[in-house]
Each structure stands twice: as C-alpha cells, then as structure tokens.
C-alpha cells in the first residue's frame, strides 16, 4: 500500500495492479496507505496486458521503469499523458510488457547496487513526472 500513498501524493490519476500476487485492499491497507485509498481509484485486473493495451489505445504513452535500458529517466517527456509501469521486486517488468511500452526509463544511480526496491523507484520516477509538469 506504500506505493499507493506515494502515487496519491504525486497526483496520480489511477493505479492499475494485477489481481494475483498483490496485497489485499482491506481495512489494514487503508490504514497503511494513510487514507490514500480514499483519494485514488485502484483497478485490479486479472490480465494486466489487456489493461495496458486499453490504456495505450486511449492515447496514453506507456513507460517502463527498468534497469534494462540505457535511457535515463530525465531524458523522457512525461508532460503528456503517461502510464508508468513498475515491475515486481524479484523479476522487474516482464519482457511481454516491455514490448508494449513506448519507452523505457532507467533511474540513474552512482552506487554499486544496480537497483532500488519498487517502492523507492516508484517515488523517484513519479517525482520526475511532477518536476517536468511543474
């Protein structure tokens, strides 16, 4: 639920999450999200690919946040309607979903560890969106 709180604070319109392998949305989730679940629609779907296909067909660019690219996240344009794809902690964004994306964004890092946890990465890229839009 921590990502939902971050999404709400960043002004995200909607969060789309897979039905499988994600936390339940219940009273504990509401408490943990600091009320963010009251302010942002959550769409749970069994087939994430179909949801992303619909989003893309609706004119929203899809950008995957992944270390599997050379594109620095600061080089991409988030001023147009954008969907940010975040992967799982273990596997990242699947190759199937990467193919659907209009672009891939990498968070620049200076340390020896090549990745952040999903919660932190979500916050970093969402605040790049805010920076560009303001």
Task: Please give the residue ranges for each predicted region.
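Post-transcriptional modification and biogenesis factors for structured RNAs
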Residues: 3-134
């Amino acid at each position: 639920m921590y990502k939902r709180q971050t999404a709400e604070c960043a002004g995200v319109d909607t969060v789309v999450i897979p039905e499988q392998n994600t936390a339940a949305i219940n009273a504990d989730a509401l408490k943990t999200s600091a009320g963010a679940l009251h302010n942002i629609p959550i769409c749970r779907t069994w087939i994430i690919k179909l949801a992303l296909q619909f989003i893309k067909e609706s004119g929203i660019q899809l950008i995957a946040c992944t270390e599997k690219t050379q594109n620095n996240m600061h080089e991409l344009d988030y001023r147009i309607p954008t969907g940010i794809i975040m992967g799982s902690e273990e596997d990242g964004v699947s190759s199937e979903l990467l193919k659907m994306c209009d672009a891939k964004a990498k968070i620049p890092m200076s340390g020896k560890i090549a990745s952040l946890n999903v919660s932190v990465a979500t916050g970093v890229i969402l605040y790049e969106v805010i920076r560009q839009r303001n």
